[in-house]
Amino acid sequence: MSDDLTRVEKPWGYELHWAKTDRYVGKVIHINAGHALSLQYHNKKDETIMLWSGKLLFEIQQEGELQKHEVKPGERFHVTPGTVHRMTAIEDCDVVEVSTPELDDVVRLEDRYGRSDAKK
């Protein structure tokens, strides 16, 4: 495991990768207020997120429908492969994510920053 923190700049904020092995990854996702990650799913990546600070709107596919949850610090969600989801910051927020190591496994369905083939 690397001892270095890796900061990855994103159009919506940044990620701090604090652990990375061949079996898991740990990161803090900082989302600036009013910004959102893409509406996405993963083919293999399995992740659990927990809101550490701020206020977050979390959309997740449940029973075939996209459900919206206003999340408070300490609340968490398990996102299994194939589950459509998106995080939008109501306030500046920090999300702790622990996942399997497939960091490039992102299928974007909508993206306000024009990344990939996603709709804006």
Regions found by a protein language model. Name each.
Residues 3-10, 88-120:
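Double-stranded beta-helix
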Residues 4-45:
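A short glycine-rich, His/Asp/Glu-containing loop-to-beta-strand
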Residues 28, 48, 67-69:
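Short, surface-exposed secondary-structure edge patches
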Residues 44-62:
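Glycine- and acidic-residue-biased ligand/ion/polar-headgroup-sensing regions
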Residues 62-82:
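Short acidic-glycine-tyrosine-enriched beta hairpin
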